[in-house]
Amino acid sequence: MSGAIGGAEVHGFRGAAAQLPRSRVLGRPIRVAPPAAARPGGASAGSIRAVSAPAKKDASEVKRSKVEIIKEKSNFLRYPLNEELVSEAPNINESAVQLIKFHGSYQQTDRDVRGQKNYSFMLRTKNPCGKVPNQLYLAMDTLADEFGIGTLRLTTRQTFQLHGVLKKNLKTVLSTVIKNMGSTLGACGDLNRNVLAPAAPYVKKDILFAQQTAENIAALLTPQSGAYYDLWVDGEKIMSAEEPPEVTKARNDNSHGTNFPDSPEPIYGTQYLPRKFKVAVTAAGDNSVDILTNDIGVVVVSDDAGEPIGFNIYVGGGMGRTHRVETTFPRLADPLGYVPKEDILYAIKAIVVTQRENGRRDDRKYSRMKYMIDRWGIDRFRAEVEKYYGKKFESFRPLPEWQFNSYLGWQEQGDGKLFYGVHVDNGRVGGQAKKTLREIIEKYNLDVSITPNQNLILCGIDQAWREPITTALAQAGLLEPKDVDPLNLTAMACPALPLCPLAQTEAERGILPILKRIRAVFNKVGIKDSESVVVRITGCPNGCARPYMAELGFVGDGPKSYQIWLGGTPNQSTLAESFMDKVKLDDIEKVLEPLFTYWNGTRQEGESFGSFTNRTGFDKLKEVVNKWAESPSAA
């Protein structure tokens, strides 16, 4: 393999931790050998260089994370998951827990139940662009009732999550998804996750091109070993469509040393990637996908006639962090360069291989690509990617200002049909709303799309169907956007408790009461009902609902306790910062009332709350909050 870095390497950190004491560990590149004793039927694969840290400075062997060992010994994601799935136990062992993530599932327990482990599995689908065929939606709806908890969860990466599946039902559920034009392969795990793109079914050249590019990138980076089909449909590889030839060509191309030519995983090898990897594609100006939060952000560039001609590429975004570890941080992506449209798959592959070869595999807190770029700087990273790309990146093309698009309500597709964006609180589809949505989707044979804001788009609607669909949705409590509080329209929360093992407090179950309390504060301080701020809540610092881009972010840091983050902007182009730690749920008004009072009284015309907090500065805002605590009238 090319691109190895010789000698020792120091893993320092910059950015958010620049002013803080930072631990620096001496790292060195090593070669990870293939499994010494591959399972029957295993193929030998090329080695992947893992950038790791010795356990001690004088250690003779490099210590890799346990997940790296599990991947190495798994025979390309098969073993020991295949054995654990047929055992009588209701759960699977730790090695299998790590591997089943690659197949699109997490093992969970119900944390509301005390004194025993109630095991179940969450399944997550892979839906590039959020596209869901009619057949798949109806299948997921049925599976939720028969094998889940009776609800479907729409996610911030345009997928479904199905909670509460018992181990004994996993194969039935996954095989049903596969046989109904769906997949869960790569929805979790150390590889490329679901690829985002604008969810709206507009018949516009740039939107269609962004969606097609997202689907091609998803296909390029899909695991190839066949383990997924071996485990869930007994080796029958069910394809809904032939792979585009340009995808196959790009995957197989090894002219710049990107591939393991003798491996069933030519891009990933035995070790896959160091950590999760996220890609989004969008049209210029459309930031419905939170483009700067991804490992790779791809933006369609068009000529004066509106014809797509290439792409601007951003790299190094990511939300996850760890409380009290200041060397971990959320980060916005940097501009990498421009590529002609025919080169996009090769450029994407080169970036992925750079992360594969140079991302840290010793400490998973630092394994995301954002830390490599923060450590190296964008110029060094670009030079390394160009070795695998085989070309120089061109200069960024000018882009318009970003705008957030929710795609809610009735809109023209551009082909004579309509689409309707349904606002779904927290993305949780259940009860009468679930029943009504199924009836509409089934009756009118509609395809749907899932948005990155956890909402659902009904696609391809005839004009004559508009009135009966609007009436049916309203009767089920799915109101038109004009009838929903603006706070709710842009708010997001992760599922958190009771099933997520990482949650430190509530998110989904707590956000609606919090939004009502924010609206009450607005009313108290004289902010109009039509006004809003972007609120996002997560139960832990991993950032699944992207709270670090919110104007007002709540990040769980203990039972009924949150960090408060301020400074994101409505178009999701600015990173928020931590404003206050350990704010108890019962005390949030003590922080919000002085902040909103000060915003309402001193903001510039049309100034958003996020822009206001950035202009004012945290020192002044903390002074305002502290004075309010001493005497509200003095603030």
From Swiss-Prot:
Its EC number is 1.8.7.1. Inhibited by the tryptophan-modifying reagent, N-bromosuccinimide (NBS), by the lysine-modifying reagent, N-acetylsuccinimide and by the arginine-modifying reagent, phenylglyoxal. Complex formation with ferredoxin prevents these inhibitions. It holds the Pfam family NIR_SIR_ferr. Siroheme binds at C544. It is found in: Plastid, Chloroplast stroma, Chloroplast nucleoid; Plastid, Chloroplast stroma; Plastid stroma. Changing R193A: Loss of sulfite reductase activity, low nitrite reductase activity and reduced siroheme redox potential. GO terms for cellular component: chloroplast nucleoid; chloroplast stroma. One of its GO terms (biological process) is sulfate assimilation. SUPFAM superfamilies: Nitrite and sulphite reductase 4Fe-4S domain-like, Nitrite/Sulfite reductase N-terminal domain-like. Phosphorylated; this phosphorylation reduces DNA-binding. Its cofactor is siroheme; [4Fe-4S] cluster. InterPro entries: NiRdtase/SiRdtase_haem-b_fer, Nit/Sulf_reduc_fer-like_dom_sf, NO2/SO3_Rdtase_4Fe4S_dom, NO2/SO3_Rdtase_4Fe4S_prot, NO2/SO3_Rdtase_4Fe4S_sf, NO2/SO3_Rdtase_FeS/sirohaem_BS, SiR_ferredoxin-dep. Present in roots and leaves (at protein level). In leaves, sulfite reductase activity is detected in both bundle sheath and mesophyll cell types. Gene3D superfamilies: Sulfite Reductase Hemoprotein, domain 1 (3.30.413.10), Sulfite Reductase Hemoprotein,Domain 2 (3.90.480.10). Optimum pH is 7.5. Keywords: 4Fe-4S, Chloroplast, DNA-binding, Heme, Iron, Iron-sulfur, Metal-binding, Oxidoreductase, Plastid, Thioether bond, Transit peptide. [4Fe-4S] cluster binds at C494, C500, C540, C544. The keyword Plastid applies. Belongs to the nitrite and sulfite reductase 4Fe-4S domain family. Essential protein with sulfite reductase activity required in assimilatory sulfate reduction pathway during both primary and secondary metabolism and thus involved in development and growth. This is Sulfite reductase [ferredoxin], chloroplastic. It comes from Zea mays. The gene is SIR.
